[in-house]
Amino acid sequence: MTPPRDHGGGLDAAIARHGGRRDDWLDLSTGINPVPYPVGQLPADAWQALPDRAATEAVIDAARAFWSVPDGAVIVPAPGASAIIARMPCLPAAGGRAYVPGPTYNEHEAALAASGRWSMTPDQDTADLLVRVHPNNPDGRLADPGIFADRALTVIDESFCDTCPGHSLVAHAARPGVIILKSFGKFWGLAGLRLGFAIGHPDTLLPADGRRNLAELLGPWPVSGPALAIGARALRDTGWAERTRSRLRHDAARLDALMVAAGADKVGGTDLFRLYGVPSATRWQEMLARHHVWSRIFPYSDTWLRLGLPSPVGWDQLERALG
């Protein structure tokens, strides 16, 4: 049985229940940078033409430089990290036992179960496949750098690691059987663009011996021309990234101060989302929703409430909701 896929978002359902227009709402249910990268103008052929190899190579080169990807690893762009997660269970490893320590982002276990090739095990030491979200969603836990072992696949999902690049495990990406996942949409605030990357050893991602490889599973032209152009531009803009990390760090501390003053306890998180302990997560979500602030709660916890960061114009609305 495939596990349920519970996610943030769902603002339409919140509006249907609590009223208001979409523009009235402050959606803090996701962990997406509320100040997106300024995309600027794009050349007409980015929209009109099928993406060519040069555009793909440009974003790969920019990604290699930005994340300091080792020379022995290859980079495969995809239409979002979720597209890679959905196909990952079909990569060359023959299947077997998979370990996904939770609570964590639920798409990994759901994709493994849906493939029919992997069964879940509670024992990391006997697992043929290990998935770690690093830092973890929703509590921000970091994986142990000694996590790598002799197993068929070790997948490190670094979708939220761009706020803390010093903790990245991408230096291990050239090891056979290791896959590092990167999400573009979260840190750069452009989730609708749909761009992600798989980084790993060529024999793991792109085997040339007739086994399934990720590029074939994704199909031709998997990433749009606009996504390739914007991705390459943004990944080369290291100054914007540094300024953004500083702002996110400041805003995360500001959010913590507001929530603690309102009676919540800090549990964890990253600089893109914060996790709090409250007496009743459902009641807190309802309280915030009455002020048109949408939050994230979890089916496995009655007390965890997760908030993303408000946009610069959203802080007053959150403060009123907490007042």
Locate the predicted segments by residue.
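N-terminal "arm"/small-domain region of PLP-dependent enzymes with the aminotransferase-like
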Residues: 1-55, 62
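PLP-dependent aminotransferase class I/II
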Residues: 179-260, 264-266
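PLP-dependent enzyme catalytic core of the Aspartate aminotransferase-like
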Residues: 290, 300-323
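Active-site phosphate-binding strand-loop segment of PLP-dependent enzymes
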Residues: 113, 120-166
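Conserved PLP-binding catalytic core of the aspartate aminotransferase-like
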Residues: 249, 259-291, 309
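Short beta-strand
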Residues: 27, 181, 265-269, 296-299
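Short, conserved charged micro-motifs
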Residues: 39, 126, 280-287, 313-318
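Conserved beta-loop-alpha segment that forms the PLP phosphate-binding cup at the N-terminus of a helix
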Residues: 57, 72-96, 106-108, 196
